[in-house]
């Protein structure tokens, strides 16, 4: 079977881009460590993108609310584009450029992190979100395509992928997402962060056990009282 050049060409393009992106491993490490500190301390990650980048942003939040590899407590992470009712209401009432910015003002708190993904680095709604985040004291990270671009300039930190096609940029963004998650989990495993989250989970578990025990005790007491009454 003949494999057409564009097919293997994409693999070649991806291999080159991935090789170049290895030089950014220290940034994904730093972001993962920082995210562990923020989320482990009760903070939140907000994430947004358009189209394929929205899927990558939601992939990141899913890894944090669920898990990346091993079991661990859930952490607060919201993909802003996933709330279709809010997104469409804001677009209808305030315009598309405000769909993420208004949600950042609603959900973001000082010390939180906003992750924005854009292959062009020029999406107006993401630039507005970055402005809203900085005004709220929320740190802005961006995953973009080639530098320079407006989103890179409007972020606190950015990782720009040097690749000729949108598809390859998005694939490298997914690699970056997994690298960040690996660094995040490693920081938790080292015990540097997440003690509050783990402690909260343990406290919740203890409270639930106490409530179950109290309920059992109340039920047993009611049963004994009923038996005495029947006698």
Swiss-Prot record:
The keyword Zinc applies. This is Phosphoheptose isomerase. Binds 1 zinc ion per subunit. Its main location: cytoplasm. GO terms for cellular component: cytoplasm; DnaA-DiaA complex. Its EC number is 5.3.1.28. Substrate binds at residues 50-52, 63, 92-93, 118-120, 123, 170. Keywords: Carbohydrate metabolism, Cytoplasm, Isomerase, Metal-binding, Zinc. It comes from Streptomyces coelicolor (strain ATCC BAA-471 / A3(2) / M145). Its cofactor is Zn(2+). The reaction produces a racemic mixture of D-glycero-alpha-D-manno-heptose 7-phosphate and D-glycero-beta-D-manno-heptose 7-phosphate.
């Amino acid at each position: 079977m003949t494999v057409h050049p564009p097919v293997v060409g994409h693999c070649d393009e991806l291999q080159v881009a991935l090789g170049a992106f290895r030089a950014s491993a220290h940034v994904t490490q730093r972001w993962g460590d920082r995210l562990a500190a923020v989320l482990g301390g009760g903070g939140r990650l907000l994430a947004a993108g358009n189209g394929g980048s929205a899927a990558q942003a939601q992939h990141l939040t899913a890894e944090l609310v669920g898990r990346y590899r091993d079991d661990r407590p859930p952490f607060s992470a919201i993909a802003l584009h996933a709330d279709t009712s809010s997104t469409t209401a804001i677009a209808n009432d305030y315009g598309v450029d405000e769909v993420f910015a208004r949600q950042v003002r609603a959900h973001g708190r000082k010390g939180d992190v906003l992750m924005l993904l854009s292959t062009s680095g020029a999406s107006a709604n993401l630039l507005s979100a970055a402005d809203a985040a900085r005004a709220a004291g929320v740190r802005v990270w961006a995953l973009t395509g080639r530098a320079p671009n407006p989103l890179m300039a409007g972020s606190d930190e950015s990782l720009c992928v040097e690749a000729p096609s949108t598809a390859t940029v998005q694939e490298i963004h997914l690699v970056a997402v997994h690298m960040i998650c690996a660094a995040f989990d490693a920081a938790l495993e080292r015990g540097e962060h997440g003690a509050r989250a783990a402690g909260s989970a343990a406290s919740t578990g203890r409270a639930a056990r106490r409530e179950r025990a109290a309920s059992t005790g109340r039920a047993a007491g009611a049963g004994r009282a009923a038996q005495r009454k029947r006698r």
